[in-house]
Amino acid sequence: MAALAICGSPTASAAARSVVGPAHGFAPHQLVVKFAGERRAHAVSLAPGTGVRRAAQALRRNPRVLYAEPDYVATASAADPEPFDPDDPGTLGAAEAGELGNWAFKQWNFLASEEGSSDLPISPGGIDAVDAWRHLIEAGRPGAAGVVVAVLDTGVAYRNYKGRFRRSPDFGAGQFVPGYDFVGHDRLPLDENGHGTHVAGTIAEKTDNGLGLTGLAYRARLMPVRVLDRNGRGNAIQIAKGIRFAIANKAQVINMSFNFACHKKVPVVDEALKEAFEAGIVTVASVGNLGSEQCVSEPATGPRVIGVGGSTEGACLGGYSLAGRGVDLLAPGGGIPQGGCPSVLARPIYQVTLRPGSTKSFAIPATYVGTSMAAAHVSGAAALVLASNAVKRSLKGRGRVEVIQRRLRSTARDLGLPRTEQGAGLIDVGKATEPR
């Protein structure tokens, strides 16, 4: 035991972060340990030259240790993108030029899947946001006004800062509640990647401003919580802290568009997720993508989490979307469908986000597909249902979570796929928000 030291210092955490690379399934020089009689696990630093797995095995022999695990690393769940073409006008600056006021031209994912009262085009893979928006206006909570959604991700481009960062032009300053950066250990969870801004935009980007596109729950407030670094990777201990920050600061929905490696149990995150469930917070996670992952994994398989797979514009399963235990629902992730799909429609999920390599220049790239994008739709849907007359607003605690989950499942559209691929089916937010 002399080779181990309990460590909560920023210096040690930074050291662990700086050497996390794509070849690592866990942070080197660090363990997550929970001792008997203690409420929460600790980060434990290891002496130089100490092997992580060997140290974990040694600690597990101590009867005072409830668990000792590597500090596993999660990665953002975006499928491999198409190359970003700066000369393609479809990927560029409408967000900055203010020319794209009509979201329906690009956001097939929000259209209805069949003819209805709207004059808008239909999309086989759409989730009928228009009917949901009408239901919320009638309920006096347009766009899920008043609901707070925590986005645990690479950060969000939510404010201007020292000339280095800019707020996304389709976000308003009043859309955000205070967040935190558990990577940089400060109160500025700004995005250096683009993934988190894209996810946040799908959940709650502004509408009716003649600029950019729109978000599903466009009047919800966002809580940016940075738990992934500029490369889209984050440690279990900081993710658990991010979940608890969202609980303490009264989020009602938590979005987690990232995954740990296959078959890894991550008890420190599971414990935080159980606390979120008891607090009445709906937790949503991507199931992961083929290539970057090999099986549905945590947090999608965590306690009471809604695991979300990705569907395409043609209402097929995305060719990247993993199948297995933990798939609860499908939502639009865009991209190329799996083999056997009768539709060739394969557009991505369009949203305003950072240009590659920039923290202050924005575009609408045609590069984002995957279950990360799908999870964002379900988080937005949960916010809409919470604000609607489809459920009792007086619900609290675990009962609220169970009702929201049941409502989303019971109104989902069966795509005729195995449950291991589609769960209950493709979300239909129009039906999910119909008044009781």
Predicted segment positions?
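Loop/turn elements at helix/coil->beta-strand transitions in domains of secreted/extracellular proteins
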Residues: 63-66, 145-148, 219-223, 248-254, ...
